[in-house]
């Protein structure tokens, strides 16, 4: 799986275009989940996330970074850069909404998580559409990203594109297992961030009907 993934990335191509329109757009909230296979409390953190998302009607994007708590087979430098260098994070499990910090709060359950999301009804300044084509014979992935932005003075935006993989089965420490005299269990890791197509914190794009292309 790792070999296939690496080859796929080498052949990926991304193109982006955008145009200005006089409107705003419904917003999806970004949920960045920080976890580690070495963290025995992280399965409980996952339980709270799922309970919260099961009640949501607002569209969301969920990605999981394996970071902070040592390294495991899914840890990448970009995830640690976001968690520790940008957010100042020093423990997992942790959740960040729309990449903004909530200082001084200890979140312990799904109800508390819900109370922290204050931007669900905020309109977005841009829309994003992603299309892709995959050629299994050549392992080539073509990604096309298009969008519209609100007609306002701001003409430059940061565009972040990452690749995530769902349903990865691997080892996971679990506090419940330790009570049973075992350290590890087989665990399904969802929505794991595997790599960034753009720079970790996004590439600056200007929207005067321009197109951008990337090869990685």
Describe the function of each predicted region.
Residues 1-25:
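Bacterial Sec-dependent N-terminal signal peptides
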Residues 7-8, 41, 104, 200:
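A broad, structure-centric signal for solvent-exposed, well-ordered loop/edge residues
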Residues 10, 23, 31, 54, ...:
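A generic structural signal for short, solvent-exposed coil/turn residues
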Residues 20-61, 65:
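Local sequence-structure signature of Cys/Sec-based thiol-disulfide redox active-site neighborhoods
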């Amino acid at each position: 799986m790792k070999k296939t993934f690496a080859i796929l990335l080498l052949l990926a191509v991304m193109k982006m275009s955008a145009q200005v329109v006089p409107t705003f757009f419904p917003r999806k909230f970004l949920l960045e989940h920080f976890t580690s296979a070495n963290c025995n409390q992280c399965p409980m953190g996952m339980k709270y996330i799922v309970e919260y998302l099961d009640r949501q009607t607002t569209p969301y994007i969920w990605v999981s970074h394996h970071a902070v708590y040592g390294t495991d087979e899914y840890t990448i430098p970009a995830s640690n850069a976001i968690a520790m260098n940008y957010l100042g994070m020093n423990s997992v499990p942790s959740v960040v909404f729309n990449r903004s910090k909530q200082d001084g709060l200890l979140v312990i359950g799904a109800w508390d998580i819900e109370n922290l999301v204050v931007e669900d009804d905020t309109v977005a300044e841009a829309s994003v559409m992603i299309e892709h084509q995959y050629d299994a014979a050549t392992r080539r992935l073509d990604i096309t990203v298009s969008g519209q932005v609100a007609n306002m003075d701001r003409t430059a935006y940061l565009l972040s594109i990452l690749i995530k993989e769902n349903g990865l089965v691997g080892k996971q420490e679990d506090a419940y297992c330790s009570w049973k005299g075992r350290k590890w269990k087989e665990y399904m890791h969802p929505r794991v961030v595997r790599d960034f197509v753009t720079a970790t914190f996004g590439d600056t794009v200007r929207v005067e009907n321009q197109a951008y292309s990337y090869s990685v």
